UniProtKB/Swiss-Prot annotation:
UniProt-annotated location(s): Plastid, Chloroplast thylakoid membrane
Provenance organism: Daucus carota (Wild carrot)
InterPro entries listed in its UniProt record: AAA+_ATPase, ATP-synt_VA_C, ATP_synth_F1_bsu, ATPase_a/bsu_AS, ATPase_alpha/beta_chains, ATPase_F1/V1/A1_a/bsu_N, ATPase_F1/V1/A1_a/bsu_N_sf, ATPase_F1/V1/A1_a/bsu_nucl-bd
Designated name of the protein: ATP synthase subunit beta, chloroplastic
Record-level GO BP terms: proton motive force-driven mitochondrial ATP synthesis
Main location: plastid
Quaternary structure and interacting proteins, as annotated: F-type ATPases have 2 components, CF(1) - the catalytic core - and CF(0) - the membrane proton channel. CF(1) has five subunits: alpha(3), beta(3), gamma(1), delta(1), epsilon(1). CF(0) has four main subunits: a(1), b(1), b'(1) and c(9-12).
SMART domains according to UniProt: AAA
Residues where ATP binds: 172-179
Keywords for the protein's UniProt record, in alphabetical order: ATP synthesis, ATP-binding, CF(1), Chloroplast, Hydrogen ion transport, Ion transport, Membrane, Nucleotide-binding, Plastid, Thylakoid, Translocase, Transport
Length: 498
């Protein structure tokens, strides 16, 4: 991280010393540039091409050096379209890697891979910038204590808890509530942990990025009146961008998150949507650079590239970066090298189910498919572990009985199984929860449920103390006291209607 000088004398001296080269070859987003002998830029240095094309249009393209070819030539990958570039154009070596603005000025704004604002809200203070290529924290700086990152979302905290400074994979198709879950997590980390979030849109649809921005403004995650009060910074490198931008936009978002962790000493949530597109962009760049492809056509450096990104996402003694990464699984093949490499880094998985969404149970997190390495008695305690296991057993038994119920009906079940089904249906409904960010759509106030309250509620359902309550009393409530109060209201309503 560096504080940039504002005086003009240092700027003049920099321009006097600038290192200039010329484009010798252009193949799509890849440029070859020749420099004077002894003036070669380093790997990862940013190069800038400025000028005018044949139609007189202004050109400003930033590239990143990827290979030193010999004979004073380097090969660089462009971060924006190379339309209008010609051989012989002048290229300036900036002498440093790409640097992006960091700190509070980034909140509520949308950036591209170069750290330039793209939301038409004016310039951003660039006095404090940080290079996107940095080493992972040293072992001695890491916080190795295993601790739960409480989200206030019942189904997550009980059955697939997140690790503070961990990495979580978010699996789900279109329209099952990924965006709403992401926004609720952004809202809750700001309220409960005083933290901020950074959202990295890597290679996804521009329309989805725009929808997310609009929904964030609507739900108050981005504060339009006072932009500094916003809880999230957005960095987009969408599907229409060249592979260089899609490959590096994840690092831009991570660099902004690292500043909040290391300098502001905050807990940070880093969202990457979609981690598969990061790998896909790396594969495209690898082919353009002429590297021999590996399994299924992926880049030979797949594990290294993934590790370089993932190892920077961690807890230090100053703060933590907890990362939630949407994972696209190509052709639903979990053995594909891209998702398989991602799985090696994940501490928990949150799987969203279309079946639950169809039932109207939101968040539609699948309680049986979602997993977490944190769900161990020595980490979460016996009470939490036992409750979670019993909830899963009850739901699993209900799942097994569903075929029998569909064919023969509930009456054919044994007394014990009927009780299990009744409790499982209550558990299923109690796993739903009203969200703060959905208040504008549903009209019901959002609820943050602490972990101890969550465990107490499920223990009461499992113990049979609440067997007499109707199952609709458990739907879309916060803690168990709200469910019992709702049951009393339902009873009073039914009595008054008689």
């Amino acid at each position: 991280m560096k504080i940039n000088p504002t005086n003009s004398s240092s700027l003049t001296s920099t321009l006097e010393k600038k290192n200039l080269g010329n484009i010798t070859q252009i193949i799509g987003p890849v440029l070859d540039v020749a420099f004077p002998p002894g003036k070669m830029p380093n790997i990862y240095n940013a190069l800038v091409v400025k000028g005018r094309d044949t139609a007189g249009q202004q050109i400003n393209v930033t590239c990143e050096v990827q290979q030193l070819l010999g004979n004073n030539r380097v090969r660089a990958v462009a971060m924006s379209a190379t339309d209008g570039l010609t051989r012989g154009m002048e290229v300036m070596d900036t002498g440093a890697p790409l640097s992006v603005p960091v700190g509070g000025t980034t909140l509520g704004r949308i950036f591209n891979v170069l750290g330039e604002p793209v939301d038409n809200l004016g310039p951003v203070d660039t006095r404090t910038t940080s290079p996107i290529h940095r080493s992972a924290p040293a072992f001695i700086q890491l916080d190795t204590k295993l601790s739960i990152f409480e989200t206030g979302i019942k189904v997550v905290d009980l059955l697939a808890p997140y690790r503070r400074g961990g990495k979580i994979g978010l699996f789900g198709g279109a329209g099952v509530g990924k965006t709403v879950l992401i926004m609720e997590l952004i809202n809750n980390i700001a309220k409960a942990h005083g933290g901020v979030s950074v959202f990295g849109g890597v290679g996804e649809r521009t329309r989805e990025g725009n929808d997310l921005y609009m929904e964030m403004k609507e739900s108050g995650v981005i504060n339009e009146e006072n932009i500094a009060e916003s809880k999230v910074a957005l960095v987009y490198g969408q599907m229409n961008e060249p592979p260089g931008a899609r490959m590096r936009v994840g690092l831009t978002a991570l660099t902004m998150a690292e500043y909040f962790r290391d300098v502001n000493e905050q807990d940070v949530l880093l969202f990457i949507d979609n981690i598969f597109r990061f790998v896909q962009a790396g594969s495209e760049v690898s082919a353009l650079l002429g590297r021999m492809p590996s399994a299924v056509g992926y880049q030979p450096t797949l594990s290294t590239e993934m590790g370089t990104l993932q190892e920077r996402i961690t807890s230090t003694k100053e703060g933590s970066i907890t990362s939630i990464q949407a994972v696209y699984v190509p052709a639903d093949d979990l053995t594909d090298p891209a998702p398989a490499t991602t799985f090696a880094h994940l501490d928990a998985t949150t799987v969203l189910s279309r079946g639950l969404a169809a039932k109207g149970i939101y968040p539609a997190v699948d309680p049986l498919d979602s997993t977490s390495t944190m769900l161990q008695p020595r980490i979460v305690g016996e009470d939490h572990y036992e409750t979670a296991q019993k909830v899963k057993q009850t739901l699993q038994r209900y799942k097994e009985l569903q075929d029998i119920i569909a064919i023969l009906g509930l009456d054919e079940l044994s007394e014990e199984d009927r009780l299990t089904v009744a409790r499982a249906r209550k558990i299923e409904r109690f796993l739903s929860q009203p969200f703060f960010v959905a208040e504008v759509f549903t009209g019901s106030p959002g609820k943050y449920v602490g972990l101890s309250e969550t465990i107490r509620g499920f223990r009461l359902i499992l113990s049979g103390e609440l067997d007499s309550l109707p199952e609709q009393a458990f739907y879309l409530v916060g803690n168990i006291d709200e469910a019992t109060a709702k049951a009393m209201n339902l009873e009073m309503e039914s009595n008054s209607n008689k």
